[in-house]
Amino acid sequence: QVGYSGIVSPDGNNIQFTHDFAHSIVLKGPSGIVTSDGKNLQLTAGQASLQAAAPAPPLPVSHYVASQQSVVGPSGIVSPSGNVQFSHEFADNVVLVGPSGIVTKDGNNLQLRA
């Protein structure tokens, strides 16, 4: 992991930055560190892979759909006309719940009824 005071390498070794280097850091990017004095640091492939790890996708949030008087949540839909329980596979495939539908990772989106 790359931080503002040093690097924990994939092999577990710690690299401590000097006080001057740490205070000159302007930006940490996926492949290196940019400093105000031009003494930039290029990360090794192993160090860069720690920075490039994909963040966990956001969890779907319960969403109130006013036109339907329904609540769409991460595990299903509760509506006056009946409830729909999502399968584990479908729930894991959800990217975004919006007022008119659900966007999925595989492109098989679900249109909500008006």
UniProtKB/Swiss-Prot annotation:
Organism the protein comes from: Cancer pagurus (Rock crab)
Repeat region (Sequence), residues: 1-17, 26-43, 70-87, 95-112
Disulfide bonding pattern of the chain: none
Pyrrolidone carboxylic acid modification, residue list: Q1
Top-level lineage group: Eukaryota
Entry protein name: Cuticle protein CP1158
Gene Ontology MF terms: structural constituent of cuticle
Expression (tissue specificity): Calcified shell.
Keyword Repeat recorded: yes
InterPro entries: Cuticle_1 (IPR012539)
